[in-house]
Amino acid sequence: MPQQLSPINIETKKAISNARLKPLDIHYNESKPTTIQNTGKLVRINFKGGYISGGFLPNEYVLSSLHIYWGKEDDYGSNHLIDVYKYSGEINLVHWNKKKYSSYEEAKKHDDGLIIISIFLQVLDHKNVYFQKIVNQLDSIRSANTSAPFDSVFYLDNLLPSKLDYFTYLGTTINHSADAVWIIFPTPINIHSDQLSKFRTLLSSSNHDGKPHYITENYRNPYKLNDDTQVYYSGEIIRAATTSPARENYFMRWLSDLRETCFSYYQKYIEENKTFAIIAIVFVFILTAILFFMSRRYSREKQN
């Protein structure tokens, strides 16, 4: 059978339950970004340290790089789709099987060599303070085929979605140069339109006519599923799959991001301005309570 090309549209109702898909162990606490690149086609951040294990993985897969995709408009820009719903953008985290193979180049030659985690970006009216760390670096790589040191403290854990249930399938890298197992989190992280628009100001490598060309979009359209391609789901996706992610409660996600922002202010100002820090942590507790009760109400509505 022909190789399944990526990306794809995931039909949640056709995904197959698999008891082997346990929660992933994500160890990004020691991952450090070293350089950020404008490849002329996308933004790439190279990492040192960090790995994933657990779940269905036979051993540890070390983090290699992060790639970001977007579109001309905020309404679309992700490579993968969930029930034909396209998100504003997509982050791909590329990992390789270091225990089994001696290098990334060697690992990409094998169907168990690469694992790619996909995180969707959804534009709302609230800035993501963690994603802003990446946005702040873009001025240093505005020209195509340039790279620069990533000169800011950045914790990749903060870009993980609030729910880590996932879909998985065997496909290819986005450029189809190698096989890859995909792990796709259907719960997105939220960013602001201004943050995403900054990526569209980067120059592309197609500059043959002497005029500046910008990377206004770089996402790929989905490929048709092969007859033998199987998509699996984990955890509580079986319940979430009855409702398309496009219909999720965006207000709850906005509150969750606001809570994270308040907590970051608390950590930042606890030494400099204790009064402001106390106000921030009070808001964290209030928002946590609101989210708890709204989550219970939302769960009851889905059951009815």
UniProtKB/Swiss-Prot annotation:
PROSITE patterns: ALPHA_CA_2. It is found in: Virion membrane. GO terms for biological process: symbiont entry into host cell; virion attachment to host cell. Residues 295-304 are intravirion. It comes from the Viruses. Induction: Expressed in the late phase of the viral replicative cycle. Apparently non-glycosylated. Residues 1-275 are virion surface. The chain crosses the membrane at residues 276-294. Its main location: virion. Keywords: Disulfide bond, Host-virus interaction, Late protein, Membrane, Transmembrane, Transmembrane helix, Viral attachment to host cell, Viral envelope protein, Virion, Virus entry into host cell. Binds to chondroitin sulfate on the cell surface to provide virion attachment to target cell. Belongs to the alpha-carbonic anhydrase family. Homodimer; disulfide-linked. This is Cell surface-binding protein OPG105. The gene is OPG105.
